């Protein structure tokens, strides 16, 4: 089905959808995710994802690495992380293990330092802490819509440089320096810089969404100080509590989010408790700005 049809067509299959927050997030009940899921259910899941931005499935304890990858193929083309090795025995799975300092506790959209970054991510909880370790998502389309008109008009014209080479220590001051350095060396084994429009047009819904997060290095055409101020103002609208949803993980939960219209933050409040999640990302499109210009990679190496 075409993007336009997916956005507008009525869907014969009605999922059991329960909104979690007012502007973003819904739990879908009564669906057992698998590589054998029927086409009508897959289509309905795709439509729910575009509408709600992030969707949750409880109790998917039957999934293993292979079936997670197999299910992902129903939603798009899985792609591995550009710099971080995959889990042994898999082609695409990225593991985030809190015990290894892999705690994504800053606001970001996945892999925006590349040109055509993933359109969606599928995250499975393998080990969940007894308390803490929630993830929060923000609706970047709602954030754009709530901007005052003069600020929207400015944002429409802005471009930002995204990179995987940034100040890791300032974002993660509590992580063991040796672990942090090991992570940095792997994460920046290839350094990318990509210019994205600050406002991208969603290829299915047509919504405009802010394209920011911690991979932003600077706003083009502004001094570093002005760039930081502009970023803070716009990013502050993204992370307003009214634009967010928070999910309390249980082992076997699956979250799927539209990476073109969200940011997320893994809350690092679980101490030494174990927390392991595994993620598959799906190939995305090169973002298009309000003026029709495409994102472009300016550095790779």
UniProtKB/Swiss-Prot annotation:
GO terms for molecular function: 2-oxoglutarate-dependent dioxygenase activity; metal ion binding. Substrate binds at residues 81, 111. InterPro entries: AtsK-like, TauD-like_sf, TauD/TfdA-like. SUPFAM superfamilies: Clavaminate synthase-like. GO terms for cellular component: cytoplasm. It comes from the Bacteria. 2-oxoglutarate binds at residues 135, 275, 279. Gene3D superfamilies: Clavaminate synthase-like. It catalyses: a primary linear alkyl sulfate ester + 2-oxoglutarate + O2 = an aldehyde + sulfate + succinate + CO2 + H(+); 2-ethylhexyl sulfate + 2-oxoglutarate + O2 = 2-ethylhexanal + sulfate + succinate + CO2 + H(+); decyl sulfate + 2-oxoglutarate + O2 = decanal + sulfate + succinate + CO2 + H(+); hexyl sulfate + 2-oxoglutarate + O2 = hexanal + sulfate + succinate + CO2 + H(+). Its cofactor is Fe(2+). Belongs to the TfdA dioxygenase family. This is Alpha-ketoglutarate-dependent sulfate ester dioxygenase. The lineage of its organism: Bacteria, Pseudomonadati, Pseudomonadota, Gammaproteobacteria, Pseudomonadales. The gene is atsK.
